[in-house]
Amino acid sequence: MSPATVTIDTTPDFSNGGAPHSTLLLAPPAMAAQQDAMAAALTDAAPLGSRPELYMLDRLAAGLTNLAPAAYDLVLVLASGADPLLSRRDVFAKIADAMKPGAKLRSRDGSPLDAAIAKEAILAGLVESAEGAYEKPAEEVAAVPLKFLKKKNKGEGGGPVQSPAAATQPTAPAPAAAAKSLPNGVVMVDLNDDFDVSDDEMIDEDELMTEEDLMRPIQQPPECAPKPGKKRRACKDCTCGLAERLEAQDKARRDKADKQLQEKAATPFKLASEDLNELDFTVQGKTGSCGSCALGDAFRCADCPYIGLPAFKPGEEVTILNNVAQL
């Protein structure tokens, strides 16, 4: 006689009835050489029903590692202080997308996160909780009903109410498109309708001030008044007309100076004999007006005719041969 078939149930007798708790560990590049520290972090983050995963921040920033969207319930940062990779906005956006709604981000040791990291967490849409962690809020989609105004001037039969004067006049046939009833929620808009905005309400800005207003003297503010002993200047955002007035005065002063220079340029300038003898050092006892022409270029005036010549003694004859001074 063959034995009866025996069925063995391999399913666990006790089950928590929920998905395993996923934990994401983010380690800086400097922690790659510390194998013991990473093993301890994985051990601490692996309680009953937890599934920890360790990723390096440099590989995540370089795009060599991709995180699954909405896959982690807890994100632990193993960096103790400020980390430049974790402060990058593109890296933090990937971390925020990988968090489930209601997931939390905090440091492993429970210390507050760096200010730069906390700023990026808030910009990524996370909300700071009372424990110092940053939680991803759950998003809800809600429908907003739109309310439309009821049509006015309706009779009991649903037709428009006509005035007695309009009832005696023959009504024009309505267009075929307007005769059709519109479904609920559909509103017909006339593009030629100006929505009861009359042209009389438009104000011409040129008519705001009359000729009498323009002829009134400008009231100068006290802060624009010239201070004693100082030159009068206009403000950067001058509105009292002082800037235009000073600019006109400067233009008139420049035009006058240019005119005087043109008049002097048209008249040739001639030196008298006594002016030439004053600078002629071949004459014994004659010196220049400054008395420093013979000392060299360092002591000569800007318009001295001896610029470029070496120093010489007063009374010594100076000749130029082949562009070379001969003393």
UniProtKB/Swiss-Prot annotation:
Main subcellular location of this protein, as a coarse class: cytoplasm
Annotated family: Belongs to the anamorsin family.
UniProt domain comment: The C-terminal domain binds 2 Fe-S clusters but is otherwise mostly in an intrinsically disordered conformation. The N-terminal domain has structural similarity with S-adenosyl-L-methionine-dependent methyltransferases, but does not bind S-adenosyl-L-methionine. It is required for correct assembly of the 2 Fe-S clusters.
Assembly with partners or alone: Monomer. Interacts with TAH18. Interacts with MIA40.
Annotated binding of [2Fe-2S] cluster, by residue: 224, 235, 238, 240
Residue numbers covered by motif Cx2C motif 1: 290-293
Protein name: Fe-S cluster assembly protein DRE2
Signal peptide: none
Residues the entry annotates as binding [4Fe-4S] cluster: 290, 293, 301, 304
Keywords: 2Fe-2S, 4Fe-4S, Cytoplasm, Iron, Iron-sulfur, Metal-binding, Mitochondrion
Chain intervals for the UniProt region annotation (Linker): 145-214
Region feature Fe-S binding site A, mapped onto this chain: 224-240
UniProt motif Cx2C motif 2: location: 301-304
Cofactor: [2Fe-2S] cluster; [4Fe-4S] cluster
UniProt feature, compositional bias: Low complexity: 164-179
Ranges where the record places region N-terminal SAM-like domain: 17-144
Physiological role: Component of the cytosolic iron-sulfur (Fe-S) protein assembly (CIA) machinery required for the maturation of extramitochondrial Fe-S proteins. Part of an electron transfer chain functioning in an early step of cytosolic Fe-S biogenesis, facilitating the de novo assembly of a [4Fe-4S] cluster on the scaffold complex CFD1-NBP35. Electrons are transferred to DRE2 from NADPH via the FAD- and FMN-containing protein TAH18.
One Gene Ontology biological process: iron-sulfur cluster assembly
Gene: DRE2
Record GO cellular component, one term: mitochondrial intermembrane space
